[in-house]
Every structure is written in structure tokens, then in C-alpha cells.
């Protein structure tokens, strides 16, 4: 296929949608495409220079006539400006709201054909989709796009059920950069964090929102720590962090739980971990599961949303019901005490990563969509 000029608009902050949008752009740039990020700030994963990657900042001014800064209008104007000046072939919007709507407005301003691809990541459907004042706008955003993808079949199904669009929604899974997420030498990393060689390490990585149920993770770890020597790594930050700290103090686990905040090299922490817990009550995919699996960490997740598409129960990990701390504890101890089971899960997970979630496969799927939409030279 010919090399394309692709505009990407996304949330630049820490979070699955921003990570995938940025990593996709980086991989596309490596394949020779010209990538233009159009965002409010530099995406946090855009940490290396590449001659094919360009950043265009959306600067929002405050005016007395507007009660709130007009980000959406400014973004639409910026997309149109960049698309016109750089002669973009494609605009890829990550999130239906506001990005797909802004891409549509930009297309109307351009008055020329430009392909709009919208990727649904979760919150734009599973949270905003339940707001009656936004549902029709989300449907409009989806149906105004030329192609629409969702990061899991579960999310696509929920979108059809809740929003009821007529547009076809294709499932294209998330992916990770296999060159980054791989198991590393662990002795020095463990020593750096004061973890003894014979201690088991449990890890949880999230944005510490209520839906992540971090308190369940702590309760499961409390049970684990009562049975074996272990440490819990809590990686990330968010509104539930203070509540998590209170629970840790209540259970007297201060010496066994490391609150590490946001980390740039989370792959180092996965490399020293024996078990990954993701016990969310709502999860459209669970990108952190792929990251952990690639680093050789067996995973336990809840049987909701897109997680069962990532973890095959009793094949590449365990699934438990939301809130079932007892079952999660039992499954965790099975993995921590049975090295053969742990190794079996790890091997199966890596095979599934290579077959279903490889960056080569996923990026090629997006490339095919772009090629279908791009005007011939």
C-alpha cells in the first residue's frame, strides 16, 4: 500500500485509549506513514523522536462569552487546519466523544473527502452511553464515521445494545510493543524495591478509579499474605488511592504493600511479579493484562466486558466473578503455589499474544482500513 498521511486525535494522558493511539501512531510511522497527532498536549507515550511523527497542539483560549473553554470547537478547527495544510488522507479519532464529532466537523469545514476512522475504547460507551443527553450524539458520531472499530467484541455488542447504531462496528483488539514488554533480569529490580528473593510478588496496575475495585485487590492480597511471604505492588494513581491507603493501614499491611504511583517503566515491575490481579467491575479490554502476559506474568481477571477475550479461563489464566474475593484468593494461591500451573498459563498466554494480539497483526488491520478509505493517487 502507498504511504499515507494520517491524523490521530486522542486523549494524551495516561489511559488505555491514549496508549493505544500513541503506540499505533509510532508503529505506523516505523512503517513509513506520516503521522500527525492533534491533541491538547504531547501524548505521554510519545517519548522518542521519529522523523515521520508530528505534533500539533490544540490551544484553547478562555473567552468571557463561553462559560467553559471551547475545547471541542477548537479541536475541530485544528483538525481541519492540519488536514488542509498537510493534505491528510485519514483522520483517526479515538473515542466517539468528543473526537469523532470534532473529526466530522473538520470534514465539513474541508469540503473534500477525507476518511474518518473512529475507535471506541470503552468509557465513551460504557459511561457516556448511559447519559440520555449524550446517547443520540454518540450514535451520530458513530454513523458519521466512515469506519468504526471497537477494542473488543464485548464493547461492540454493548454499543449495539445501548446506542443502537446502524453502522457496522469491527473488532480490532489492542496490542503492545513486544520489544518493550518482555521479561527482564529480576534480581537487581527486586533488590531496588527491597523485595526478598523468596517473597512472592503480586501486582496491580490501574488508574485507581472506583470501577477498578482496588479494595478487592487489597483484600485478596491480605489473604495471600496470611498464607505466604509476599509483597503487593500498586502501580498508578487516581481518585481511589487514598481509600486504598486507608484499607492498607486498617489491615496492617504497610510493610507489605508498595504504593509506586505512575511509572514509566512498568515492564520492569511486571518482570519481578508472580501474579497480576485485575478485578474490575467494568473493563472493555484490559490492556494491562497484555502487558503482564508479555512479561511472563500469570493473570487473574474478572469475568466481565472484554476480559474473557484476553484471558481464557483455566487455559491462559483464571476468571472470577466480580467481588468474589474468596474465589480470587483460591485461584491466586493455586498460581503462587503451583509452578507447573504458572508456567502453563504463561506459555499459553504468550502463544495467544503472538496469534491474536501481536502488533504486526493489529497494525496491519488498521492499515487495511486506511487503505480502503484513502483516495488513490
Curated annotation (Swiss-Prot):
Top-level taxon of origin: Bacteria
PANTHER family: SULFOQUINOVOSYL TRANSFERASE SQD2
The encoding gene: bshA
Statement: the UniProt record of this protein carries the keyword Glycosyltransferase: yes
Keywords: Glycosyltransferase, Nucleotide-binding, Transferase
Binding sites annotated in the UniProt record for (S)-malate: 17, 95, 123
Subunit structure: Homotetramer.
Name the UniProt record assigns to this protein: N-acetyl-alpha-D-glucosaminyl L-malate synthase
Regulation: Inhibited by BSH.
Enzyme Commission identifier(s): 2.4.1.-
Naturally occurring in which organism (per UniProt): Bacillus subtilis (strain 168)
Amino acid at each position: 500500500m502507498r504511504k499515507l498521511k494520517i491524523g490521530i486525535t486522542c486523549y494524551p494522558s495516561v489511559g488505555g485509549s491514549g496508549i493505544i493511539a500513541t503506540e499505533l501512531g509510532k508503529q505506523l510511522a516505523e512503517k513509513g506513514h506520516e503521522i500527525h497527532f492533534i491533541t491538547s498536549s504531547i501524548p505521554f507515550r510519545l517519548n522518542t523522536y521519529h522523523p515521520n511523527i508530528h505534533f500539533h497542539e490544540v490551544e484553547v483560549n478562555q473567552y468571557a462569552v463561553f462559560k467553559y473553554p471551547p475545547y471541542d470547537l477548537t479541536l475541530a478547527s485544528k483538525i481541519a487546519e492540519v488536514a488542509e495544510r498537510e493534505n491528510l488522507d485519514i483522520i483517526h479519532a479515538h473515542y466517539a466523544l468528543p473526537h469523532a464529532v470534532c473529526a466530522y466537523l473538520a470534514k465539513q469545514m474541508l469540503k473534500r473527502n477525507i476518511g474518518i476512522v473512529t475507535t471506541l475504547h470503552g468509557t465513551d460507551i460504557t459511561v457516556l452511553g448511559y447519559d440520555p443527553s449524550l446517547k443520540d450524539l454518540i450514535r451520530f458520531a458513530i454513523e458519521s464515521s466512515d469506519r468504526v472499530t471497537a477494542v473488543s467484541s464485548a464493547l461492540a455488542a454493548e454499543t449495539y445494545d445501548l446506542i443502537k447504531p446502524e453502522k457496522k462496528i469491527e473488532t480490532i483488539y489492542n496490542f503492545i510493543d513486544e520489544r518493550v514488554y518482555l521479561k527482564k533480569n529480576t534480581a537487581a529490580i527486586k533488590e531496588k524495591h527491597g523485595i526478598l528473593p523468596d517473597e512472592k510478588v503480586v501486582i496491580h496496575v490501574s488508574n485507581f478509579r472506583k470501577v477498578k475495585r482496588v479494595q478487592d485487590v487489597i483484600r485478596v492480597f491480605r489473604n495471600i499474605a496470611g498464607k505466604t511471604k509476599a509483597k503487593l505492588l500498586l502501580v498508578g494513581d487516581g481518585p481511589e488511592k487514598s481509600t486504598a491507603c486507608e484499607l492498607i493501614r486498617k489491615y496492617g499491611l504497610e510493610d507489605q504493600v508498595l504504593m509506586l504511583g505512575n511509572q514509566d517503566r512498568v515492564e520492569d515491575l511486571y518482570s519481578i511479579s508472580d501474579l497480576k490481579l485485575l478485578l474490575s467491575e467494568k473493563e472493555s479490554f484490559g490492556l494491562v493484562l497484555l502487558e503482564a502476559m508479555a512479561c511472563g506474568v500469570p493473570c487473574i481477571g474478572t469475568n466481565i466486558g472484554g476480559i474473557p477475550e484476553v484471558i481464557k479461563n483455566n487455559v491462559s489464566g483464571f476468571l472470577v466473578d466480580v467481588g468474589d474475593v474468596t474465589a480470587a484468593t483460591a485461584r491466586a494461591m493455586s498460581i503462587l503455589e503451583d509452578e507447573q500451573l504458572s508456567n502453563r498459563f504463561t506459555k499459553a498466554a504468550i502463544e495467544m499474544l503472538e496469534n491474536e494480539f501481536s502488533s504486526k497483526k493489529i497494525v496491519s488491520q488498521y492499515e487495511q482500513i486506511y487503505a480502503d478509505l484513502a483516495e488513490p493517487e
